[in-house]
């Protein structure tokens, strides 16, 4: 959520910067609402002051033995007018809030301006794609050939975009998650967390999935009088970041660095027809998430560090990748700047996203009222929040199967994973 003061004082600038994201802000309507809000606010305060002043005179009139019926009637009339103005003001504030909640974050000035993914900017590459002297198989053929990926059973049990893994491939998938967690906790300074896979609406509002992206979620329990609705998490970013919702942490606690390995659930409502085969786009998938909560002046540097943590996973696994900075038109709703890390997939002969690392600045923190107390003046200030995949486990599995395949259909286990595989060097 954007800063209301900045929005009011710099409306034209806000509209201009949001336009680079493809979001058209109705400046005229918002200006009209703001004028109406001011007018109603003044009227409400004046009516409140008048009613209070006249109410005080009732006791004085009674003390003098005067008839107070007329004054009581006047107070009642002012009260009715005040109630009516409060209703009007609440309606205007609700509309303004709805508009504010629908606005994406302002892009950082360092984010390249562009309309879509074709205008993203590559910033670096690591490793060189392997040259094969035999016909390349994709991860689907490799996994099925090794009796490790069972798409048919998943369709029978649940439906499309799910997977059953078996044997050493299931073990490799588990090893990947453990390897990532160990790397981030022992070398990168993150604290591991075990978090709920079901979250309430307040949590999804806090991180920005609601109200705009409700159709992308799996909702398991509707809201009732007894409690809020629950939804399966689309990413562990939601529960991890919400750990500081409605909180004020001490400055000495920062930065807070959290990681979790969870299943994630997405309806993929907007991706009909995309990646219909294989593990690239599943309704249920594993991911190791990285979250950092930092002081505002530290967040841009923290984004570079967090992105480096995700890249380190690929380097340790020997997987070629490139890192691109997203242009304004391709960034996620809550992001001010995002790096996508794309791993090389020989089966597709292209780089595919395996991690997205973003600086949300105070966009999520304002929604969540997540703050820290500055030691110098003891005042609470909004945190800056960052998140990134470190990494998407299923897509990393895809990359290993395809990059480490052998001519006979077997797959070499990357050296970094062998301790997690009981010393196994090859699958198949």
UniProtKB/Swiss-Prot annotation:
GO terms for biological process: selenocysteine biosynthetic process; seryl-tRNA aminoacylation. It catalyses: tRNA(Ser) + L-serine + ATP = L-seryl-tRNA(Ser) + AMP + diphosphate + H(+); tRNA(Sec) + L-serine + ATP = L-seryl-tRNA(Sec) + AMP + diphosphate + H(+). ATP binds at residues 266-268, 353-356. GO terms for cellular component: cytoplasm. Pfam families: Seryl_tRNA_N, tRNA-synt_2b. L-serine binds at residues 235-237, 289, 389. Its EC number is 6.1.1.11. CDD domains: SerRS_core (cd00770). Belongs to the class-II aminoacyl-tRNA synthetase family. Type-1 seryl-tRNA synthetase subfamily. Consists of two distinct domains, a catalytic core and a N-terminal extension that is involved in tRNA binding. Homodimer. The tRNA molecule binds across the dimer. This is Serine--tRNA ligase. It comes from Shewanella oneidensis (strain ATCC 700550 / JCM 31522 / CIP 106686 / LMG 19005 / NCIMB 14063 / MR-1). The gene is serS.
